[in-house]
């Protein structure tokens, strides 16, 4: 991670601007690996009816097959890139109206992906081979999550020193907010793990139509709309208020309300019409705080 910034002062206006970049290629996550797939025997037995109720039934091997079992372990395959600009400006206090103004905000871009192979298959029937097929191995980084946003926060603070009263109003605007996913080759594997011996083999894409590898073909199970990047959400406003009363020089009581107008608009996806997202859904809350100084 690295960042560079500048502080400035023009008259009573003070501020700072910072640009940063942050990246990692070995972040923590839990994931399956080639070593966490195990080929085991899958035995089915039939039971003969005992001669009497006190005897145990006699078991005989009915069938024996090979299947794959898997589990996940802690790994360092999480990767991301992040960059952005942050700013904070204090416009100072206008004494004639006993009010100060401040503005801060940020622009951010974020991308994350798994820096390792992914493992996927699907069942093709009720038989052992259909229920426990080979495991498809897909190329690293074939799915990446993206997000970006541009936000500003205007803070207005008005105080009346004579009665120890302070009102702070904050207007937060998300000018741009976007989340979408990009995909690489997530339909035909580049390798596979055999259910018969647990070994990893390179996969010849020309064999994807063979019955043995039907469970590795994801083309018919993926929605083509996933390849269309989602558009940005429109701007949204959230207003917060805080009222503080100072009682003498040892007590302070505050009342606050976040998203005071309960603005929670609904946004409809352009890629998946009929899919709605309620914005600002968890930002409305209010309360009171009491602080006492003990000297």
Language-model features, listed with the residues they occupy:
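C-terminal beta-signal and adjacent terminal beta-strands/loops
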Residues: 30, 172-222, 233-235, 243-295
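Repeated loop/turn-to-beta-strand initiation elements of outer-membrane beta-barrel proteins
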Residues: 12-15, 95-100, 162-167, 249-253, ...
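Residues that define the transmembrane beta-barrel architecture of outer-membrane proteins
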Residues: 2, 9, 79-85, 146-152, ...
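Transmembrane beta-strands of outer-membrane beta-barrel pores
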Residues: 10-12, 21-25, 91-93, 105-111, ...
